[in-house]
């Protein structure tokens, strides 16, 4: 270290230290003194007259080094020639002043003090080791009680805590010398020194083996963990008590003189000053042999001063400065957003950057951006100076500077040259995914705004209403190469989130291409036949045919396919003109249709697959130009008459009003409850809104015209509003409905829907009341957006943190395990086809055609678009794929299990940081997810209230594990929960399958035939019925008015209903028994009623099987938490237990009800072999299974959401992953956001990395300990090799926050959350951070081990083979001539 300082000022800078890992541990007092450059004895800082540091003070030059470079404090030695000399007068070494940033001092304490992190960071480590509660420990340390350090021969225990009275009593009783005790940190230190860790560890392991109580075992395990940590790390427990304190280098806690003789100082100086003052006072008191009380008080104050220095506010009130705000302690310097980690180490401000407003640059090519000259001049300054010197315009930097300031013409020429092919990076905040920073080649422009290419707006989420963007300049050659190859906008055509193009024409461009490719009946030149596309163009340019005329053209579909014969194609003139922008590889059929936004996206996708990246970029740019041009020529505009209000609107509204009145009457008569009435009213209005919208859209989208034969035909309309929405350029059906239909139902800020809808639309105008209702929802939306952004950002941060070390580390892990992927269906409808789910994955085994048995896909082959088509054509329902979840790589993930890199369209490269990409892909759409999924107009709630099932196909009806009862009307009533109805065609192939709910009425008997569109089943969506399976006479049991049942009077209707209420008496179980109606009168059925059930029968009534005896109103059955949007995603990733989660069965078997115990229902599941299992279900919860039902493992026994931890325990990792992926996807699908499954799988993999040890066997693991899966496997492998008993463990699901905090790397965890806790634990364990993840490397200032920085590439060096000039020339001549476009690209 020495020569580093004294080395010449002009030497080349030394290489930075090379290190491969970093360790953290507790410093011993010797270590602290050894590292220190001297003791700070005085609290003084600077002499305020001379501004020189005081000797032995906090800024002492003798200890910390000189304040001026190469100059001692008294000025005897100045300048370089004396370097390394120590001045004999003031004792200051003559060296550069920067050592004041790195030299530590120390303070010797007069009495030991405890380190607050090890005391108060829960669980208290000192308390754990000594087995003292934190409260008692604090009493000892703050001099309120005594601790026994050596019990001697007395019956007192080691470490026992006694109050002062008891201590004096004990001294009287046993004699003063019989035992030793004390108070304060000194006593605690003696106790810690007396610990024999090895013996203690053995003793604790024995205790664990012997103890029977779970709580005791857990307590002992916690203590053992701390003991083992100290044993293995080589830290000594007494080091947690400090004898001397290190003092931070003065430049890191500066004191800056302000004008007016005042000083601005860092809070740390105040805190150090307090410590030194109290320490010196204590030394003096000890020398004077002051009374014990005074000394004790002073020691306590010293302890408090040191506590405040390390972590102010952790104990007691925070010490405040003169301005009443708490002082910032050492811990606060590290913590939180503005702490060292997040402010300075993870994110830094950079030079060579600028920012400005953006404007659109429609004439730019995709790889360009417009950079204002002013900005370019400033950014490229050093380059310009260099070039000016090279050219000989100037000789010195100073004159170059002058020249640039005067903006001489030569400067602009040089600037043009410097800028050429030097990419710049543009960034728009917030950067939510990697496409938020992209590289462009700058084009110099006048003005002060940056020009941005319109096609990259989607990726940046930018618009031109005043957004700003930042420009950054890559300097080194390496960074320029990376910028060009990896970040250029032309290399980021596909989105990493779903693999579809993200560079897609939008708005005007879409409208232009849409208008071009529409056909109009009766246009000029209709039905003409042309010999070639060129002829069409000539005719159009001469005005002989209209753009939208339908014509026949003789042409080849794909110009690239020479074997094809020309054919007559039906098309329009506009499509032929659009064909001119296509590359030769893309067939004409790709655009021979009306091109809306979706079709354009598909076109770019097809082009990327067929013609490659370069052609796609050219196509995108040409589409942009064509789109803008023809949108301009079309001159589409909208006026108020374009909003056509449907004629039947009033009739629909009147009918709805009548229906609502009808419902109101039913409610007044007491037939339905208030909740049901509300639900039905909302439903009626939602339906009516839909009807009006349907009629209006029908009117808008069609128009009747007369064709050339004089016949009337209906064609898609040319209404401007319709065209905008239909093409996907702007607006949606929802918005048009509000313009010309009716606004519909509105929501209150609480998310409830107001039951009076707004029947007017914007064209008619709103009344004051209607306007007021609207403002409600609108303001809520604005407030939500503001809050949402922060939440979304936080979710992304947690996701990145948990997944940052998921990197592609090997090509193939060789696993034999995978996931079975099938189409995603909901209610018999296929939501996502199997093809979309397997595209870009790698097959696990060979995939065979089920009929011909030929191999479609070989094992370990990537499934591309062609193979997907093969698999779909073969009609495969399920295929086994490799997945990230089953990847066996120890660190990171293998390329085969990950599959395709979605943004590049081929198998993922080594070193790709797939974890971060996954986190960004999930977090980026987060801002779009609404806080609560209330869709104005209740379209969301319509989906839930499905009341019947219609068959989609013709065929025979089959019941699949359905248990039914035929009721009095002769219908089959469903009595089981997870039954399904299937429709099979004549060959016996199943065409569709639906789940049917309990209590549904089946309209068609088993094996009966059904036509398409016929109703299969219907049910009441607003109540959950309780049905009887048998007929007989009703008897009530424990249904006592005022105890378990209340007759509730409805204020409005005056009618009463019998409702089951909660009772204080736990023995009472309200139930309805069905007695045999015959002579015997025995009980043949018994039904327990949950709280809130409404009784539908009277006592002694005779009923039939399938009748409803009670119903539970829907409000209470909505227990499945309807947390929508972001909170739901966060809840899933945090693996929280839902509020009322359902108890699930762990085994297959038959259900019986056992005796109730403690007011809980007992459900017994009896398997065919083995022991029955019992489950207790809290009373008042509705049990969804019935006596005698057969349940499978993992099925819920009651209402409620699933608990992911239960799924993992019962059904295993794959089922859990499937559940999490499907649930997260459901939230995003509601918002129309596409995310590939594999991103969610990557995160789930990170959540499942750890296992919990159940049995330790003969390994070194601890019971209940959470360890990484591979650590557990390695330990077991060792045990097997030595013939010992292995440990057993269960998989563990950690939420993303927990998982981030428990990563191997303590640096990464500390920079995430709970910094002090993480560092405390790491120091005790003497943890070594091997710097494997991204975050810890960024913090240490190294290249990240991903992308171009992975270890395999890090040590590559380029070297140029020597070649003569002639060889070089011949090689150049041999190179093929590049055409102009290739050179441009």
From Swiss-Prot:
Gene Ontology cellular-component annotations: DNA-directed RNA polymerase complex
Task: Tell me the residue numbers annotated for binding Zn(2+) 1.
Answer: 72, 74, 87, 90
Q: How cofactor binds (record note)? A: Binds 1 Mg(2+) ion per subunit. Binds 2 Zn(2+) ions per subunit.
Q: Which residues form a coiled coil?
A: none
- Keyword check for DNA-binding: no
Which residues of this UniProt protein bind Mg(2+)? 463, 465, 467
- Tell me, how does this one assemble? The RNAP catalytic core consists of 2 alpha, 1 beta, 1 beta' and 1 omega subunit. When a sigma factor is associated with the core the holoenzyme is formed, which can initiate transcription.
Name listed for the protein in its UniProt record: DNA-directed RNA polymerase subunit beta'
